[in-house]
Amino acid sequence: MNHLPEKMRPYRDLLEKSAKEYVKLNVRKGKTGRYDSKIAGDPYFPKHETYPTDENGQPMKLLAQINFSHIPQLDGYPSSGILQFYISVHDDVYGLNFDDRCEQKNFRVIYFENIVENDDELVSDFSFIGTGECDFPILSEAAVEPVKSSEWVLPTDFQFEQYTGMETMEFFGQFGEDEEDIYNELAENGFGHKIGGYASFTQHDPREYAYKEHTIMLLQIDSDDDIDSMWGDVGIANFFITPEDLRKKDFSNVLYNWDCS
């Protein structure tokens, strides 16, 4: 559970109502198997499926892969199947459309519900992606170790107001000269790589103004020297989905965002 700053302790009961489970992804550089959960590397991909391409017809690269059979179960998320996140390697903003963050032209989210277990039926050579001179935020393939945990709502997440009953800046303003320190101390809890839980941002939550139904975080990938991950100037990336779309296992309207300081 989150570390709670001393002056925030009177609000513990409010924050406890926001508790949400998530899966923390501990990462390490290294080769991964095609069925493994991973960051970067080569995907599980059946030969009979159409490989994702960007708006210019160029193959996209795997950003992350989640094998739900290999991670602790989260309420509402699939219990099996493989979920993949791809982004264009020929786009200097890593596939993000600032005007429509759900438009999957230069990023793609793919879910394989039924897994092909015959290796002969899977793509094994991904040299066609051509990443020699590419724009991609992660330089090293990484294996993940999933650990289930829980956290309270973060001040960076637009849902913070729902639990405190006050606008975020108004809430922290009551701490006077300690406002910034307390905000930063609480926000620090939310960084890192994870599935589920609440989102961290270096700028602001785009769901504060639109996409308010995208309340569930599918994935967060942070800047991380250990795996040569760098989103702009030490930024962070998130993918969100609506509860209804997640229930239907429909990943066509996923919200993608990344920002940096």
Swiss-Prot record:
Q: Which Pfam families match?
A: DUF1963
**Domain of life per record:** Bacteria
From the Swiss-Prot or TrEMBL record, give the protein name: Uncharacterized protein YwqG
User: Can you name the source organism?
Assistant: Bacillus subtilis (strain 168)
- Lineage in the entry? Bacteria, Bacillati, Bacillota, Bacilli, Bacillales
